[in-house]
Regions:
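Active-site rim helix/loop that mediates acceptor-substrate recognition in acyltransferases
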Residues: 27-53, 57-58, 62-67, 171-192
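Amide-forming acyltransferase catalytic core, primarily the GNAT-like/NAT-type
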Residues: 34, 129-212
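Conserved beta-strand in the GNAT
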Residues: 53, 60-69, 76-81, 194, ...
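Residue-level recognition of the GNAT/N-acetyltransferase active site
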Residues: 78, 83, 87, 116, ...
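Conserved acetyl-CoA-binding loop-helix of GNAT-fold acetyltransferases
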Residues: 82, 88-101, 124-128, 224-239
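Conserved active-site alpha-helix within GNAT-family acetyltransferase domains
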Residues: 89, 93, 117-135, 253-270
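Conserved GNAT acetyl-CoA-binding A-motif
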Residues: 103-114, 241-252
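Conserved catalytic-core motifs of GNAT/GCN5-like acyltransferases
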Residues: 112-115, 132-145, 267-278
């Protein structure tokens, strides 16, 4: 009835078409092109050899997928879905249990994912299959401020200047997409600014732009004589000067950047659960 195949570079266009179809009606629709998939593949450590496509019947109709990322002994479901007409048929359970078996056999110790908190059926499905909610991720709209920043912002700072010890010293709690591996591997057109006060570096900011928004990837404090909240307030004023709505997405609630944004008037427009399973 069901068969599974691993992903491959030759199947990328078929994978993106299937994923886009399944997620077209979701709160956050996915609209991958081959090019954007390859960018996400690099940034999020997607491994096609660990990703699976689910087929139905002798004609091998593609009906579902699990796109999987991997770092060390940790695996992550980047996206998981079944075509609408095959839901409630047992296909989801067949796929997820085969994913568990395959990853455990390959030596992975844990599997994590993010799911939109209002998608109660999806949340219940993952809980029934052994996942536990580890924390909540908030996406913010940051209020517009007058662009009267007091610090200096120099462009073309290298991403390679950000190291794991910077996050540790600042007591950060990054999610998968903000881990140093994601930042170093990313091929996306991000901007990196060095933030300076009185000829001294106090922080770095990684950010990007779309046609509709400016978005913060992260703000890294490198000098601890300046309050992190002051750095964030100034950085958001700087980014507001580009004249587009300012957002940041999937920010863990136990991360200091989340607390500063929340207490300074930013509004949550989406919440996700980060969930984890021991394999």
């Amino acid at each position: 009835m069901y068969t599974l195949q691993y992903g491959s570079k030759e199947k990328i266009e078929n994978i993106t078409e299937l994923v886009n179809e399944v997620f077209k009606d979701y709160v956050i629709p996915i609209n991958w092109t081959k090019e954007s998939f390859l960018l996400d593949m690099a940034e999020n450590s997607i491994i096609l050899d660990h990703s699976q496509i689910l087929y139905f019947g002798n004609e091998k109709l593609p009906i579902g997928f699990c796109i999987t990322s991997a770092r060390g002994k940790r695996a992550r479901i980047d996206s998981f879905g079944i075509k609408n007409e095959f839901r409630k048929t047992g296909a989801s359970y067949f796929l997820i249990n085969n994913v568990f078996y395959d990853l455990a056999k390959k030596g992975f110790s844990s599997l994590q994912l993010e799911v939109e908190s209002s998608q109660t059926r999806a949340v219940d499905f993952y809980i029934k299959n052994g996942f536990k909610i580890s924390r909540t991720l908030d996406s913010f709209i940051i209020p517009e401020k007058t662009s009267c920043h007091k610090f200096n912002y120099s462009l073309n700072c290298s991403k390679s200047s950000i190291h794991h010890d910077v996050l540790l010293k600042a007591k950060r709690a990054p999610n998968w997409q903000r881990e140093i591996t994601s930042i170093q591997n990313s091929k996306k057109d991000y901007f990196m600014n060095q933030i300076r006060s009185e000829d001294k570096e106090i922080a770095k900011i990684l950010w990007g732009r779309t046609e509709d928004t400016t978005y913060i990837v992260d703000i890294y404090q490198t000098d601890f004589t300046t309050e992190y909240s002051d750095i964030i307030q100034d950085a958001t004023s700087y980014l507001n000067s580009f004249g587009k709505p300012l957002i940041t997405v999937s920010l863990p609630q136990n991360d200091p950047l989340n607390y500063v944004l929340l207490t300074s008037g930013s509004k949550i427009f989406l919440q996700q659960y980060e969930m984890i399973l021991s394999l």
